[in-house]
């Protein structure tokens, strides 16, 4: 059963925001010192009452380093499976807008690596939302948080099983938020997911979002990939 937004909406009184980690690098470094990826844990008495999620989710972080392979830059930060643990994690890491240029966050179902080559992603694609640079301060964190709450709260009707994860790319030339799905050929499913995504993020009709196939992105020769679906769809005459 989907979790309503009211159940997953941020409650400041039940999440300790004192002494948050100043940088995501610190969160990653603290996990590097443990044998296994840590599980986020809420610290308040109220958190003893847990609200389980339908899936376990893993947060990944990437800080680009030209001297390292891409996979070596990718770190799994934490795994969680309750609403409370999500907020404990979210409140103690940097917001997307606070990340350095070239950094990414990935939130994927546990067991799915945030890369095109993963068997769960190889036939899939992504809904891509480009953040208006002039409205970055208002939109980036809003888009990212709304997307996170939507996927962990199973807000995509009966299509939750088709969703793999979410990504935010922080770039000086323009930030991007994306939602990855499992099968790029399921046009009806992906269209409905995109419609829900656009509504959740409150993106106006004047700003289209596009669905791109991973394989097309991996072999592109220019900066743009021809989308498989665009919302709103252009009228045919």
Where are the regions a protein language model picked out?
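Eukaryotic intrinsically disordered and solvent-exposed regulatory patches
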Residues: 43-46, 112-116, 152, 161-166
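Short glycine-/aliphatic-rich beta-strand segments at the starts of folded cytosolic domains
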Residues: 123-133
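Long, polar low-complexity intrinsically disordered regions
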Residues: 1-44, 48-54, 201-204, 216-237
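Eukaryote-biased feature marking scaffold/signaling PDZ-domain proteins and nuclear chromatin regulators
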Residues: 52-54, 72, 81-84, 102-103, ...
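Intrinsically disordered, low-complexity, Lys/Arg-biased terminal tails
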Residues: 5, 136, 140, 144-237
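Short, structured protein-protein interaction patches enriched in aromatics and acidic/basic residues
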Residues: 102-119, 167-172, 176
């Amino acid at each position: 059963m989907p979790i309503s937004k009211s159940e997953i909406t941020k409650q400041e009184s039940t999440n300790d925001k004192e002494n948050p980690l100043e940088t995501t690098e610190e969160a990653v470094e603290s996990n590097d010192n443990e044998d296994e990826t840590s599980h986020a844990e809420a610290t308040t008495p109220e958190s003893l009452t847990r609200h389980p999620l339908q899936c376990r989710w893993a947060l990944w972080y990437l800080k680009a380093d030209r001297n390292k392979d891409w996979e070596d830059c990718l770190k799994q930060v934490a795994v969680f499976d309750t609403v409370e643990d999500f907020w404990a994690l979210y409140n103690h890491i940097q917001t997307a807008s606070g990340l350095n240029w070239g950094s990414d966050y990935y939130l994927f179902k546990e067991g799915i690596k945030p890369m095109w080559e993963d068997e769960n992603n190889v036939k899939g694609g992504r809904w891509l939302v480009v953040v208006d640079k002039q409205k970055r301060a208002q939109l980036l964190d809003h888009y990212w948080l709304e997307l996170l709450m939507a996927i962990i709260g199973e807000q995509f009707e009966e299509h939750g099983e088709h969703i793999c994860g979410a990504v935010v790319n922080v770039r000086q030339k323009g930030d991007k938020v994306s939602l990855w799905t499992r099968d790029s050929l399921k046009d009806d499913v992906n269209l409905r997911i995109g419609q829900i995504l656009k509504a959740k993020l409150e993106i106006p009709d004047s700003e289209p979002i596009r669905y791109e196939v991973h394989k097309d992105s991996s072999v592109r020769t220019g900066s743009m990939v021809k989308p498989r679906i665009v919302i709103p769809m252009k009228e045919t005459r």
